[in-house]
UniProtKB/Swiss-Prot annotation:
To B.subtilis YqaT and phage SPP1 terminase large subunit. The gene is xtmB. This is PBSX phage terminase large subunit. It comes from Bacillus subtilis (strain 168). Dimer of a small and a large subunit. Keywords: Viral genome packaging, Viral release from host cell. It comes from the Bacteria.
Length: 433
């Protein structure tokens, strides 16, 4: 009999099979993947099952999950009881249990998989949400209790893992506050077992590795949050750090208090995947504050249906600055009685418009503008292959930001450099004696 020592924080997890779903999130080196491999091996020794191990890219299995299972099997002295096959990549147990390894980069191969009662999705944040839902459909067996294990390092709160297992602001769906998980470490919510871990939970980890993780705090706070703290958050550099959400009534009161408010409306066109986005803005030119107090956000809409839903603009005759790349749509809306013109577009306009919005000292958004909040509150810059920021590209396609760009087409926000330059200019007027 072999006695196997495990990290205390994982003891309950290794032997707990009460829930259908188990979601493990944690930092680097926390041993969540190791204990998941151990958990599955012990389960398959006890019961005849077929388990499916998934990663986004199949070729990453051999040096990660497959190697991890081989390590566990060797440590348990089971090399004669479990056969390792390289083609196809598979582990076969003496009692008929099997572990199969597949990648979501070749979904056709999943169609040949049957009677799967246990699925482990390693680095599940890398798998697409559609893939996750497809795997739920593959989890079926006529007799055995079904289980799905998801393990991941935390990424941004925009990732599907956070929206599915914790909260989705856009769909007003709340499951669990992630801060509660960080505090309690393990939580059962419905049919899901949650587990949080960090390097501190791995008693077999060298102290030098922990110090290396601690050092991230000085030069890479995003990676420190992920790797050392094991926590979700905003990933990357925010485009609009001055963006704040306020109650709608408060936003209206602030706008009413502006001595000379400037009102603007902008529209970005969409159809299938992209959205028709319209925003109403108010500018406080003295304070350089931007207020966003109304939105329209729909996709899969033809121009005639959109025009009907926006009929109030015909009555108010507000000027709408729209995406000039859609001249036919603009012409149609004009024929229906809308005051609509195309906003200027030119080489580099994306960057210039973004810089203009960034020059506002504060951006206040009504809590009724849910899609503006969803797109802009945590909007971050995209990066090139070398990790450098791309100043006019973002991690998502923010249609509401485009609408704001167009709304502000003919309005300029003075930046600090220009203001400072004006203040430093000498007064050319001769003093009166």
């Amino acid at each position: 009999m072999i006695v196997k020592e495990i990290n205390p924080h994982f003891e309950d997890y290794v032997f707990n099979w009460e829930q259908t779903y188990q979601f493990l999130v944690g930092g680097y080196g926390s041993s969540k993947s190791y204990h998941t491999a151990l958990k599955i091996v012990l389960k398959l020794l006890k019961e005849k099952r077929t388990a499916l191990v998934i990663r986004e890219v199949f070729d990453t299995h051999r040096d990660s999950t497959f190697a991890l299972f081989q390590e566990v099997i060797e440590e348990l002295g089971l090399t004669k009881a479990v056969a390792s096959l390289s083609s196809p990549l598979q582990l076969r147990f003496h009692n008929g249990s099997r572990i199969m390894f597949k990648g979501m980069d070749n979904p056709a191969k999943l169609k040949s998989v049957h009677n799967i009662s246990l699925i482990w999705i390693e680095e599940c944040s890398e798998v697409k949400y559609e893939g996750f839902k497809e795997l739920i459909g593959r989890l079926r067996h006529p007799e055995l209790k079904l289980h799905m294990i998801c393990t991941t390092n935390p990424v941004g709160t925009s990732n599907w893992t956070y929206r599915h297992f914790f909260r989705d602001e856009r769909k007003k769906r709340f499951v669990l506050d992630d801060s509660e998980l960080y505090e309690k470490r393990t939580i059962v919510k419905g049919d899901t077992y949650y587990h949080h871990s960090t390097a501190n939970d791995n008693l077999f980890l060298p102290e030098s590795y922990v110090k290396q993780l601690d050092g991230l705090k000085e030069y890479d706070p995003d990676l420190y949050r992920i790797a050392r703290k094991g926590r979700f958050g905003v990933n990357g550099i925010r485009v609009l750090p001055q963006f704040e959400v306020l109650p709608h009534d408060q936003v209206k009161k602030c706008i009413a208090a502006i001595s000379k408010p400037i009102f603007r409306t902008g529209m970005d066109f969409g159809f299938e995947e992209s959205y028709n986005a319209v925003v109403r803005l108010a500018v406080d030119p003295e304070k350089k504050y931007l207020y966003i107090y109304w939105e329209y956000y729909q996709n899969k809409m033809t121009d005639d249906r959109t025009a009907e839903e926006l009929r109030e603009f015909i009555e108010t005759q507000e000027l709408i600055k729209a995406d000039s790349a859609e001249p036919k749509s603009i012409q149609y809306f004009r024929q229906q009685g809308f005051r609509m013109v195309g906003a200027r577009k030119f080489p580099g306009s994306r960057l210039q418009y973004t810089k203009k919005v960034k020059r506002f000292k504060k951006i206040f958004c009504s809590d009724r503008c849910e899609n503006v909040i969803y797109e802009l509150e945590t909007l971050t810059y995209a990066k090139d292959k070398n990790g450098a920021l791309i100043e006019d590209e973002f991690t998502i396609d923010p249609h509401t930001l485009s609408a704001i760009w167009y709304a502000l087409d003919d309005y300029e926000v003075a930046d600090m450099k220009e203001t400072a330059h004006k203040r430093m200019r000498p007064n050319r007027e001769r003093r009166r004696s």
